[in-house]
Amino acid sequence: TTLFRSWSGNCGNLSTAAGAFAIHAGLVDASRIPHNGTCVVRIWQANIQKTIIAHVPITNGQVQETGDFELDGVTFPAAEIVLEFLDPSDEGEDGGALFPTGNLVDDLEVPASVVKSGVLKATLISAGIPTMFVNAEDIGYEGTELREAINTDPQALARFEAIRVAGALRMGLIKRPEEAATRQHTPKIAFVAPAKDYRTASGKEIIAGEIDLLVRALSMGKLHHAMMGTCAVAIGTAAAIPGTLVNLAAGGGEREAVRFGHPSGTLRVGAQAEQVAGQWTVTKAVMSRSAR
């Protein structure tokens, strides 16, 4: 096993904790911290060269840690921290290059062991974190799968890695397939499907009418137990742009927010996207997390 450190991405949960920690550690000027209310902490994420704004609740001059906000996949409720990811795509002052290939949907060449035709449709997007989305149906899934269905199947994991390698090459993140082995953090790979009833890992029933679509995502070679915060940014951004696979799974059309179903429950995420001179841009993506 080769050990390596990757500086290629970000973590949404750690971004949430960073704002609260900055206040605890005295990194935020005391004059900016209300006795009761919300403290706005601007975070510079050096890995991705982006600004993240954390809205941290304050009670009696201290970071509020308890509350009734429940983040599915995290044990026990806590205080709600709202995160704003400013200009979450890779480049540009007014929204950036969202789609590295210039396409809302690409035809990826993949091994026949992945799909018999050797071609798989994918949306390749850089927002929050470089992410590739494919249709669950195209790879033989429902979109309701839990971790055990995939993480205990070595062949399934190998198929997903083959898809991820193809996406990384097309996005320009790697030049040779073998480089993907030392770039496990990015791109993320997720599969989407229209909303349908399912049960979460804890047995909770999610009704199709409660969500806009289903999303399952892999991180570091395994299906995630819930949803990564950075991938949620990519989901919200892609959903806001008509024609992406995420948008189509959600029913198509223009939308500023979606609630999607993941293995542990649901999550709502929003994004502000617009088309300028024929190019889609996104100025902000917003979601709530807890710092537990």
Model segments located where?
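Conserved glycine-rich phosphate/nucleotide-binding loop
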Residues: 30-109, 197-216, 237-292
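A conserved active-site cap/scaffold subdomain adjacent to cofactor or substrate pockets
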Residues: 119-177
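DPxDG-like acidic metal-binding loop motif
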Residues: 13-27, 231, 236-237
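Short, small-residue-biased leader/transition segments that mark boundaries at the very start
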Residues: 2-3
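C-terminal catalytic subdomain
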Residues: 144-146, 161-190, 196-205, 210-255
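Internal alpha/beta core interface subdomains
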Residues: 29, 91-98, 108-141
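Active-site histidine-anchored catalytic micro-motif
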Residues: 9-19, 42, 49-53
